Structures are given as structure tokens and as C-alpha cells.
Amino acid sequence: MKLALLYFNTITGPEIYFSHPGSIKESICKKILGFFDLDMSDQFFEVSLIEDELKLINLYFEITSCWARGNKEMLMLSVITDKNHKSEIFYDILKEYSIKIMSAVNLYKAFYVKGYLKENDPEIELKINELHTLILECYDKLGERLNINLEDEKIIKKFKKFEW
């Protein structure tokens, strides 16, 4: 499982702002960015990548920004996981962390690192660290949920073997 935070840069278009653990395969990156670039009405959606045997579970949301055109930053949390996992097990955690990101004061500054007139703002580095911490916490919670779900599935399979 991997977790990515996507950001819509109004100058260059969609980009993967942060992923954990490590980077995401180039072919998968292109697909995720393509889905983020679509005009979606649903905030929560999944995409099956049949050839890759993966599933992308996505939650789109926006945060208020004093610096962005239209006063909002467009973001998406994406879980890249095995095709067999149900997207529903991830929803409440993705929602919880989208709310935490939306609620964090001035967190939009984390997206203005290079090439912006505001890059000298002393709060930028603090906000980058705060955002990374939130994403890592989200990843840990998703991992815990996945492990619990896998254990539950093992127990269910054992009980199904019994004849009642």
C-alpha cells in the first residue's frame, strides 16, 4: 500500500506533492495525475488498474488559500493498494485526514515552495513539516485498518470452513 497527496498547481497542472513510502512507479503516477485532472463531481472514487492488479482509492477535497487563484487549493489523497481490498475500509480515515488538512491554519503555504514570490515566508517550512506529519499519520492509520481487516477476513474464512 502507498499513500499519495496530489496537488493541483495552477501553473504546471496536477502533481504528486508527497508519497509514502517512497516514490510511485512512473506509469502509475501518470494514471493518478490523469484522474486528478478530470472534472469529477464525486469526492470519493476508486479506479481499478486491471493490468497492474491495483486499485486507486481517491478522496478529492479543497482547502482555503489566501494565495491561490480562486482562494482554494485542490487536493486529493490517493491510496494505491492491491486490487482485492475494498475501498470502503479506507474512506473514514481519508475523510478524517482531509478534514485535519482543511482545518490546519495556513497549511496552503506548504504548496508554495519554489518559484513563487512568497517563498521567503518563514511559515512555509513549518507548514511543509505539519503536512508531512499528517500524511504519515494517515498512512499509519490506513495500515492499521488494513491489518485489522485482513485479520477479520482470515477469521471469517476459518468459520466458513465449519459445517453448522
Language-model-detected regions and their locations in the chain:
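Acidic, low-complexity cytosolic segments
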Residues: I11, I16-W164
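Short N-terminal helix-loop-first-beta-strand/juxtamembrane motif that initiates sensory/input modules
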Residues: M1-G13
